[in-house]
């Protein structure tokens, strides 16, 4: 992941050691923004329960996976094929944070939770919350590939 810093007028690569740091002062991490890991490729999934349209799935990292979390518990709305909650555990199996998804809307062939709220569980951050609200989504947008270059970071930062 790359970041342009206007103050020093430089584009820097964010090293792996910084991927767990806060993204723009929020409760999200840099890793959350790039989703380096793939749940399907990096985790073993086990169905814990199914009640009506809600399934609870436990995700345990595969032995060779370079992932951040020791375990993730996901509740999924089966009917709409969207997450309801994700509970993240560290490598000591301590519950670290909970993300909730709400306001599911249909956009073309996609069902999308338009609100994501991340709540850290650390005692020093108990009152923190970061909410992301999608006002509009477009899955068919035509985006010029040049937008995804390091040069574009500087060009669009002002």
Predicted regions and their residues:
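Short, low-complexity, Pro/Ser/Thr/Gly-rich segments in the mature regions of secreted, periplasmic
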Residues: 144-158
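An acidic-aromatic
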Residues: 1-28
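Gly/Pro-enriched, hydrophobic low-complexity segments
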Residues: 21, 31-34, 52-148
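A surface/extracellular/periplasmic glyco- and lipid-processing/surface-interacting theme
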Residues: 25-32, 40
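Generic alpha-helical secondary structure signal
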Residues: 8, 32, 47, 93, ...
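Residue-level detector of beta-propeller blades
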Residues: 11-13, 47, 83, 95
């Amino acid at each position: 992941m790359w970041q342009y810093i206007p103050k020093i007028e430089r584009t820097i690569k964010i090293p792996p050691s910084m991927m767990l740091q806060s993204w723009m002062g929020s409760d999200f991490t840099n890793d959350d923004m790039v989703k380096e890991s793939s749940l399907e490729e990096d985790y073993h999934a086990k169905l814990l329960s199914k009640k009506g349209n809600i399934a609870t799935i436990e995700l345990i990292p595969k032995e060779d996976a370079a992932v951040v979390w020791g375990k993730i518990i996901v509740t999924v709305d089966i009917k709409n094929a969207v997450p309801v909650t994700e509970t993240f555990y560290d490598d000591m199996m301590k519950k670290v944070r909970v993300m909730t998804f709400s306001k599911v809307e249909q956009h073309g062939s996609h069902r999308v939770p338009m609100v994501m709220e991340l709540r850290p569980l650390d005692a020093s951050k108990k009152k923190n919350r970061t909410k992301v609200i999608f006002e509009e989504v477009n899955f068919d947008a035509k985006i010029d590939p040049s937008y995804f270059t390091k040069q574009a970071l500087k060009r669009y930062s002002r």
